[in-house]
Amino acid sequence: MYQTTAALRSAFLEYFRTNGHQVVDSSSLVPANDPTLLFTNAGMNQFKDVFLGADKRSYSRATSSQRCVRAGGKHNDLDNVGYTARHHTFFEMLGNFSFGDYFKEEAIHFAWTFLTEELKLPKERLCVTIYDTDDEAFEIWNKKIGVAAENIIRIGDNKGAAYASDNFWQMGDTGPCGPCSEIFYDHGDHIWGGRPGTPEEDGDRFIEIWNIVFMQYNRQADGEMKPLPKPSVDTGMGIERIAAIMQGVHSNYEIDIFQALIKKAAAILGVTDLENKSLRVIADHIRSCAFLIADGVMPSNEGRGYVLRRIIRRAVRHGNKLGATESFFYKLVPTLIEVMGADAAKGLQETQAIVEKSLKAEEEQFARTLERGLGILDAALNELATNVLDGETAFKLYDTYGFPVDLTADVCRERDITVDEAGFEVAMAAQRSRAQAAGQFETDYNEGLIIDEQSGFTGYTDLNNQATVTAIFKAGESVDSIVAGDDVVIVLDNTPFYGESGGQCGDEGVLIADGIEFTVTDTQKYGQAIGHIGRVATGTVKVGQVVTANVDKKLRHRTELNHSVTHLLHAALRQVLGTHVSQKGSLVDPERLRFDFSHFEGVKAHELKEVEELVNTQIRRNHELTAEVMDIETAKEKGAMALFGEKYDSEVRVVTMGDFSIELCGGTHVGRTGDIGLFKITSEGGIAAGIRRIEAVTGAAAMAYVAKQQAQLEEAAALLKGDSASVVAKLKAQLDKTKLLEKELSQLKDKLAAATSADLAGEAVDVNGVKVLVKKLEGVDAGALRGLQDELKQKLQSGIVVLAIAGEDKVNMIVGVTKDLTGKVKAGELVASIAVQVGGKGGGRPDMAQAGGSQPENLDAALEQVIPWISAKLA
């Protein structure tokens, strides 16, 4: 019964569907519009706004099987993955949810019935925990369900603070939270461990399988617990844990999904020991990596992309440990798709090619430095006098060889060695400061402003209408009236102003009434409300006041041009580059558009030209734009593209442009594509690994851009004494002439260096029997230094050469050591000792090294130290 994980997933969802729950698809691993989360890490993440009362759904009961990742931030299981039976970077969370519908009694009943009647788990194998003061939950378990009192365990605040308990659940430092009740399964007395709340609770005998959270509060940044609008329920059951029970095994790695991946990895790598922990690591990591890429995350050096990179590189290192000599990780994707089941792997199957290509590219990139880095780490570990690796070495491995510190710690752990993480953090301080400045993950949620009011939007057809002020917020607090000079957010019962979303900026304009003018500088969405952000210019505005809302027509029109063309651009990119292209972000305002999309290489010039021409062709065809509302399943059947990071309701708005483009979109658009006039790409480049960005202009702005380009072309033609038609030919001739002159100049420099070296060689001094030349040069180009030191070494035959040039604000230097002396004096060490005195750094080979510096005023003093330094080495 339910012997596969896929069958178990289906049974769970069907059970709750028959009990009145809406089956909701798993959301993306990248939380939509939630800067407080790195990754989706619980089933309730996609319902956060519902619990907060900021989002309304057509259903009050839901169930889902949510893909989750815990490998960064507060919820980080990466270090333990592969070494324990139940830690994973990726897992599926089965859950049922009540949004102000049922509460404790029904939630407990649903869970108990599913486990004991549907799955037929023996009741004597189950025990439950509750929050210490939750007497209501105790009564339900004991009196209504019939669980004996001794099998109901109260857990208090056991983590050193109020509400800090295993039985008080919270998603993060802020957000929905509440007491919870957990159901545990007893794997039997042949496994060590004790019941929850005992000293032996960390053993593997009693395993939590279901957590039922009674969502009652919204935790604020200051720790205050504010009651949620309606008590709700959030539950979670890890599918891997319940699958292990149903399949009669103890470790999650023994269930069907992991066994298939482990066996495939073993076959690829030629490994026969299926119990090898490295195989577990690889089997776990392919799940998180593949699904993260499928959800739009690409390997990079910051944010989510860096977490993905860390996981991939950890898997590759374990493959290397098992003897991998070529790329292997990406080859597991087909097996993963097969074993996950059609429903769970649908998104992965659609992006299989891009996932495999991205994994292979990252693996090949890391392979170029992996062996060398491991060699350096191995040498450092062999030389250790203690069981702690210094932070400086860990940082060097990170900075030079791309080793995430947890990968270094992973290698060290296998030899019972720890990493000096404090030392590593000191070395990383500069990089961390830059990352923090980027401010990727903020702690505020919706800027703390939760508005209960709802606003109707009339802006698809009207740019002005009368409306009633339903709420005013000043400095985050609700107020009844405001006066001239006040900066506030005004909410209307209906409005033509578009609230920023989907990449389209919020409208600007004015709200007016007798003696009143309110300047709107931005418009934002707050749940179901549309907030008009701005300042009172004149008069007093009160809640209940009737005003006329006027959108700035010119700004709106220019924004619509840019928004509509992003749809054409998206379709054109997919047609020219391939269907793997998907939108990763956009910015649309009155001045320009910015469009981010997935692609594995720079867009070639001819491809960019083809995209631009294709978009302009669709503009000239003057397609009519149509917008219609339909249920999301119908929209998908029509081929409408959904955009990365966006949340959609059960009913969606579909915007169609002829037979060329169809997308889900709530934004505003032109009436016909011909209204756009002209589309001109101004730049294309990479912003992260696998993510490209196009910036462009439309309409009058595009015409102005073309006119400016034409003016610059004519100016260039005049400088070249020709016309615009001859610019390329004349410029090519000029470049050829310049190249020839540069060659002649280089030859003259070489002759000068040879002549100079003959004079300089005679200035060498004897230091302990070795000829040493230390010289600060005047009037010599930095590019001639290398050739000059080569000439001098040849003339000296055996000796050391130190040459330096001082500019206004910089120093260039080179050190040459003849081969017979490198055993005693190394050029890299010598140049580094000089460079540090002039505010620089450098390095190179034992026989030749270069350096630069930013303190020319210290050069003379630094050069005076060279001969004593060499003398000490030779002694």
Curated annotation (Swiss-Prot):
Keyword Coiled coil: no
Segments crossing the lipid bilayer: none
Cofactor(s) listed: Zn(2+)
Cofactor: how and how many bound: Binds 1 zinc ion per subunit.
Keyword entries, A-Z: Aminoacyl-tRNA synthetase, ATP-binding, Cytoplasm, Ligase, Metal-binding, Nucleotide-binding, Protein biosynthesis, RNA-binding, tRNA-binding, Zinc
EC number: 6.1.1.7
Subcellular location: Cytoplasm
Gene Ontology molecular function, alphabetical: alanine-tRNA ligase activity; aminoacyl-tRNA deacylase activity; ATP binding; tRNA binding; zinc ion binding
Keyword Ligase: yes
Classification via Pfam families: DHHA1, tRNA-synt_2c, tRNA_SAD
CDD domains, alphabetized: AlaRS_core
Known catalytic reactions: tRNA(Ala) + L-alanine + ATP = L-alanyl-tRNA(Ala) + AMP + diphosphate
GO cellular component term of the entry, any: cytosol
Function: Catalyzes the attachment of alanine to tRNA(Ala) in a two-step reaction: alanine is first activated by ATP to form Ala-AMP and then transferred to the acceptor end of tRNA(Ala). Also edits incorrectly charged Ser-tRNA(Ala) and Gly-tRNA(Ala) via its editing domain.
Domain remarks: Consists of three domains; the N-terminal catalytic domain, the editing domain and the C-terminal C-Ala domain. The editing domain removes incorrectly charged amino acids, while the C-Ala domain, along with tRNA(Ala), serves as a bridge to cooperatively bring together the editing and aminoacylation centers thus stimulating deacylation of misacylated tRNAs.
Family: Belongs to the class-II aminoacyl-tRNA synthetase family.
Protein name (database record): Alanine--tRNA ligase
Organism: Shewanella pealeana (strain ATCC 700345 / ANG-SQ1)
